[in-house]
């Protein structure tokens, strides 16, 4: 049994080393095609197996992930010429569940044409949430200018992880976005995306809108707006904030006040939110995050 384990371990390391060597070779070939202006993969004629085709697709995806303001047209021509999109679509059709989601995720990181976008549209209605979101990612990455309309048409709730992925796409594509229409949208996903944009990019001008959301006391958005206000280090000793925090359940309030303390707010800023019997605990909590320089 020990001998079998050693053989499997050695074989696994050998495959990883071989894949790394091939990926380096294929990446050099892709770069050569970009600089030479050709779409022929002349330097890797043996790339015929499905493993090799996936390695080339991963190289192209990593190249897109590692660059900003890259013209997608040359890479899109390479993808079409080498039929990497056809290969991935075939894999997506043949597999299901998380493996299908992984192929969709890989496809979302590559420049694809409108025909490919239409081919994955049906997967946005899958019962598997990972498949749904990865299919949506393909649509969004293909046309970032239509990101808001794609999310608006998406009929499922975006999780916080999925919202963070959308933010990553925005940063990668250096895509300008107006946060105010998002926050004021009737669509829940767009509102949460707007809050995420304000939080991620530290937009202090959104303070008035955030306070308005807190005052409206909408469960999910108001809690999110409170955390964003604290992240922006806004003044939180306001009547609307005090009223909202006072109406939170004890567990939510405790978590929020711990976050406020971590953001560097003083004990005085917390006084209006803290019940009398809990003041000693929160004063010691604030002191644990601050250094006495007296």
Q: Can you describe what each PLM-predicted range is?
A:
Residues 1-4, 103:
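Single-pass alpha-helical transmembrane signal-anchor segments
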Residues 7-96:
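N-terminal topogenic membrane-targeting module
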Residues 8-15, 124-160, 167-168:
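Long, contiguous interaction/recruitment modules in multidomain scaffold/adaptor proteins
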Residues 27-28, 53, 57, 72, ...:
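Short amphipathic alpha-helical segments that mediate assembly, nucleic-acid/protein binding
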Residues 44-47, 76-93, 113-124, 144-155, ...:
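Amphipathic alpha-helical scaffolding segments comprising HEAT/armadillo-like alpha-solenoid repeats
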Residues 52, 95-96, 127-129, 155-160, ...:
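Short inter-helical turns and helix N-cap capping residues of alpha-solenoid HEAT/ARM repeat scaffolds
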Residues 62-79, 101-112, 132-142, 160-172, ...:
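Structural detector for internal amphipathic alpha-helices that build alpha-solenoid repeat scaffolds
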Residues 261, 271-274, 280, 290:
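Extended, charge- and Ser/Thr-rich helical segments
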């Amino acid at each position: 049994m020990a001998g079998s384990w050693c053989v499997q371990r050695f074989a696994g390391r050998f495959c990883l080393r071989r894949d790394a060597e091939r990926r380096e070779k294929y990446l050099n070939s892709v770069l050569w095609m970009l600089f030479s202006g050709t779409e022929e993969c002349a330097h890797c004629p043996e790339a015929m197996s499905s493993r090799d085709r996936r390695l080339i697709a991963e190289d192209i995806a990593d190249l897109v992930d590692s660059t900003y303001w890259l013209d997608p047209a040359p890479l899109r021509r390479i993808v079409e010429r080498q039929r990497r999109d056809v290969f991935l679509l075939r894999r997506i059709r043949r597999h299901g569940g998380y493996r299908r989601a992984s192929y969709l995720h890989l496809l979302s990181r590559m420049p694809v044409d409108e025909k490919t976008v239409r081919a994955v549209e049906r997967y946005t209605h899958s019962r598997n949430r990972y498949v749904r979101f990865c299919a949506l990612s393909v649509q969004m990455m293909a046309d970032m200018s239509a990101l808001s309309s794609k999310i608006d048409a998406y009929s499922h709730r975006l999780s916080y992880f999925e919202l963070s992925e959308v933010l990553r796409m925005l940063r990668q594509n250096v895509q300008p976005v107006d946060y105010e229409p998002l926050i004021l949208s009737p669509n829940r996903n767009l509102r949460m995306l707007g809050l995420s944009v304000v939080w991620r990019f530290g937009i202090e001008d959104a303070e008035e809108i955030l306070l308005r959301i807190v005052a409206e006391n909408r469960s999910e958005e108001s809690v999110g707006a409170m955390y964003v206000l604290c992240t922006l280090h806004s003044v939180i000793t306001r009547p609307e904030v005090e009223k909202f925090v006072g109406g939170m359940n004890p567990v939510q309030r405790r978590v929020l006040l711990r976050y406020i303390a971590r953001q560097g707010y003083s004990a005085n800023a917390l006084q209006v939110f803290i019940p009398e019997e809990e003041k000693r605990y929160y004063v010691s909590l604030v002191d644990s995050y601050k250094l006495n320089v007296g």
